[in-house]
């Protein structure tokens, strides 16, 4: 499997966060309607998805190219899901005093080779500028021509604005053309992604893509994996420890199936992006996780992305063992 870095530019607000598992579903719909995109139809691509995934999609992360300063572009990843005393080398008393301040630090700059996670500088979300907004809507009573009480009362819809450019990471099987994935992504960006795409939300532009290797520039002391999207760890992964924030995906079918008698999928409990997986024996892995089956009551073969691309990181595992 090859890995790619894709830079996109948000053009509107978003009703649905750009998470890897949801974006994977959008790409599947593009392949369903145009089998020439990847040279194979969707059913063929999903036939061995449990053992040989054709595509793995990461969540989106802030990307700043700093063209005016001629500096290298900076990618901001989510703070790892580890207890504070594993992320900050501070005395316990100071950790308690600064707990709120430290918890507000939500990102770090991804610049390989990464130092140990306890030596990274973490930044607050204010430094990244991702704005959450609300839009007031109302339903018009067709008899009175006005809003009213109950189901016709004004209501608030949350909206997310990505102020910076964004970067996505894709894992693509070697027999799959990356050009087809890029074209699918362009179509999604043109017509809109997620909730309220028909109202003009969720539009973006694909700016560039390039092949990358997460293991090309490392310190050789890495001992853990950082998940780039929500993941369901494989039971046979031989992990010594897994640290994560739980994320429940209340999924629903898209496209024409959104109007089916039962558009809702079964809930899936996942480890959110930023999860840290510590294997008993560290080895080079491009991705972790597994396919999620049985999520739909109307389509037996429906799958959900439980895979995640990973970045090698170094965790003070001796410190973790001493605290357990």
Q: Positions of the model-derived regions?
A:
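Conserved active-site/ligand-binding neighborhood in enzyme cores
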Residues: 1-324
């Amino acid at each position: 499997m090859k890995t790619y870095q894709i830079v996109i530019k948000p053009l509107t607000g978003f009703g649905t966060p750009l998470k890897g598992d949801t974006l994977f579903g959008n790409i599947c719909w593009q392949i369903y309607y145009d089998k020439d995109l990847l040279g194979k139809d969707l059913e063929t691509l999903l036939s061995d998805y449990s053992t040989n995934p054709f595509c793995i999609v990461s969540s989106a992360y802030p990307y700043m190219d700093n063209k005016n300063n001629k500096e290298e572009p900076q990618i901001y990843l989510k703070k790892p899901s580890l207890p504070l005393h594993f992320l900050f080398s501070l005395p316990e008393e100071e950790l308690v005093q600064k707990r709120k301040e430290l918890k507000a630090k939500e990102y770090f700059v991804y610049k390989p080779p990464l130092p140990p996670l306890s030596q990274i500088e973490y930044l607050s979300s204010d430094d990244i500028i991702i704005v959450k907004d609300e839009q007031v809507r109302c339903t018009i009573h067709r008899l009175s021509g006005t809003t009213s009480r109950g189901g016709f009362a004004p209501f608030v819809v949350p909206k997310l604005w990505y102020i910076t450019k964004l970067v996505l990471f894709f894992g693509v099987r070697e027999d799959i053309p990356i050009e087809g994935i890029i074209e699918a992504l362009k179509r999604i960006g043109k017509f809109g992604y997620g909730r309220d795409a028909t109202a003009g939300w969720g539009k973006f532009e694909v700016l560039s893509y390039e092949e990358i290797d997460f293991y090309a520039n490392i310190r050789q002391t890495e001992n853990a994996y950082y998940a780039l999207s929500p993941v369901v760890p494989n039971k046979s992964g031989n992990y010594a420890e897994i640290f994560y924030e739980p994320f429940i995906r209340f999924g629903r079918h898209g496209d024409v199936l959104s109007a089916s008698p039962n558009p809702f999928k079964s809930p899936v409990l996942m480890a959110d992006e930023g999860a840290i997986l510590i294997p008993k024996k560290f080895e080079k892995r491009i991705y972790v996780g597994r396919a999620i089956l049985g999520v739909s009551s109307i389509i037996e073969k429906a799958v959900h992305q439980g895979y995640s691309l990973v970045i090698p990181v170094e965790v003070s595992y001796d410190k973790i063992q001493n605290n357990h």
